[in-house]
Amino acid sequence: HQLTPEVENTFWVNLIGRGYPAPRHKFRWCTERLKIKPSNAFILNVVRANGEAILVLGTRKAESSVRRHRMEKLEGDRVRDRLSPNGSLPNSLVYSPIEDWSNDDVWLYLMQSSNPWGYNNKDLLAMYAGASEDNECPLVVDTSTPSCGDSRFGCWTCTLVDKDKSMSAMIQNDEEKEWMLPLLELRNDLDITDDRHLRDFRRMSGKVQLFHDRPIHGPYTEDARHDWLQRLLEAQTWIRSNG
């Protein structure tokens, strides 16, 4: 199953249509709408049809200290080895078979096993290598040396990180990836620190919200949203011709 958000919850409908400012850690409106709601709706449908659901996830403690802490916190509620209750959805469990694997464990398995849907895993390795700054993907025993598993792929519009290092490296290391340059430029322009000159004081309802008797900036202005739409369409046209 390929899950997608409802049209009213898609990224550009909210940013251009409703004028939501680019996501920030204090206003992270994207994750709930784009990822969590579609997933939860699908899981609830499975539970209704079958009485329960088990999610098989590739989450690993080695991904980050935050991920390790969250996973270890849930271990006390396990019903059996690697099988934990889903805290947000009743009658659903989370199975994490590779939770203790390192990055190198993952790559060693992929290089030694065939892909069930027919793609060559070496192409995947090459893609991760291209997303690293030195264009390499070493399998290492020295934990101070980063492996290619540290390359991260998320939404190309993501403004929750300072820089999209993976996309930048892919463009730099591979001429065939230069078609992504308009996307990177658009993403970087969305990620401006001070966007107050692009935003209106009025909410969609027409109301003005105050904080200590001073108006708070609200959605993007109509002119700003028109500019984002024009630039997005220009990037789309260029990519269709050159990508």
Regions inferred by a protein language model and the residue ranges of each:
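Nucleotide-activated chemistry modules centered on ATP-dependent adenylation/adenylyltransferase
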Residues: H1-G243
